[in-house]
Regions:
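Juxtamembrane/disordered regions of integral membrane proteins
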Residues: 1-139
Length: 139
């Protein structure tokens, strides 16, 4: 049980780090205007209204990638025998996906984004499941 909790926390942290790395990588191709920073919510809200479509799609990809990597890492760090015997592990990757989904929903509520961007919420759980399955099927 303790191992499942620890690996979940590590997976979530590394998944969030991967997601932020993807965000910053996408800013190489679509840089923020000079007056906008990631810390300033008001300026970021104004930018979200005029952001290019491809930049917004890269945000969705980075969110799904973070969820995918979080589950992948959590699964890799867990013992393989736990996959068969532990109830805690069955919900480990689900928790990772739900946490990413919740944080995205929170951002959707607090930042101004196009209505179509809510589709972002649909990608977390499938990405988490894919990250889990890629490792679990090797066991």
């Amino acid at each position: 049980m303790l191992r499942a909790i620890t690996t979940t926390i590590i997976g979530v942290i590394l998944g969030m780090m991967a997601m932020m790395a993807m965000h910053y990588l996408s800013m190489v191709f679509y840089p923020l205007p000079e007056a906008v920073t990631m810390e300033g919510a008001e300026a970021l809200n104004k930018y979200m209204e005029i952001a290019p479509l491809v930049a917004m799609l890269l945000v969705i990809v980075s969110h799904a990638m973070g969820s995918f990597i979080g589950a992948l890492v959590a699964t890799l760090l867990s013992e393989r025998e736990e996959w068969k015997n532990s109830t805690a592990f069955k919900y480990q990757c689900l928790f990772t996906g739900l946490l990413f989904t919740y944080t995205s929903w929170y951002n959707l509520e607090n930042l101004i984004q196009p209505d179509w961007f809510k589709i972002d919420l649909l990608f977390y759980l499938p990405a988490t499941y894919l990250g889990y399955k890629l490792v679990a099927k090797r066991a």
